[in-house]
Amino acid sequence: MRIVFGGSFDPVHVGHIILARDVCEHFNAKEVIFVPTYQAPLKEKHKASAQDRLNMLKLALEREEKFTIEDYEIRRKGISYTVYTLKYLKEKYGGEELYLLLGSDSFLKFHKWKEPREILKLAKIIVVEREGMLEKVKEYIKEYFPELRKNEDIFFYKGRRIDISSTE
């Protein structure tokens, strides 16, 4: 299994790295694939350029054996849609099982993403629980994605508390 960790990484920080290490170990993943966005559809424009964010990511991850960087979205340019990236990665890795890593705040907007149900066919979801968000996430699933089965289609990960968020 490979874990896909998409984000703006503007900038990449120790919280991203600690989370990726912890999730990789917890799920016994082959690797964590960092996918920096070119431009996220639901976020403001980035402060750093795509190339600068990619370079920062390369520097931050250079000593991490189980981490790779996929620059597909940056090479593709334009608005980055996860569904296209997952299709690309499925082809690249021969259909190997993919798990999409999402913070609970991002997951609560998942119904607004391009082709969310297609994404669910391409990857299983790992939701990183934020303090006090689990009930909200469970209600959200009941409302928007009642077909998701815990520990089959969607997994919840409660790791160490790291008080760093790119959305705050």
Curated annotation (Swiss-Prot):
Annotated SUPFAM superfamilies: Nucleotidylyl transferase (SSF52374)
Pathway(s) per entry: Cofactor biosynthesis; NAD(+) biosynthesis; deamido-NAD(+) from nicotinate D-ribonucleotide: step 1/1
Pfam families per the UniProt record, alphabetical: CTP_transf_like (PF01467)
Entry's Gene Ontology BP terms: NAD biosynthetic process
Gene3D superfamilies given in the database record: HUPs
GO molecular function annotations of the record: ATP binding; nicotinamide-nucleotide adenylyltransferase activity; nicotinate-nucleotide adenylyltransferase activity
Enzyme class: transferase
EC number: 2.7.7.18
Catalytic activity: nicotinate beta-D-ribonucleotide + ATP + H(+) = deamido-NAD(+) + diphosphate
InterPro entries named among the record's database cross-references: Cyt_trans-like, NadD/NMNAT, Rossmann-like_a/b/a_fold
Top-level taxon of origin: Bacteria
Keywords: ATP-binding, NAD, Nucleotide-binding, Nucleotidyltransferase, Pyridine nucleotide biosynthesis, Transferase
Cross-referenced PANTHER family: NICOTINATE-NUCLEOTIDE ADENYLYLTRANSFERASE-RELATED, PHOSPHOPANTETHEINE ADENYLYLTRANSFERASE
Its biological purpose: Catalyzes the reversible adenylation of nicotinate mononucleotide (NaMN) to nicotinic acid adenine dinucleotide (NaAD).
Family statement: Belongs to the NadD family.
Protein name from the UniProt record: Probable nicotinate-nucleotide adenylyltransferase
Organism of origin: Aquifex aeolicus (strain VF5)
Gene that produces this protein: nadD
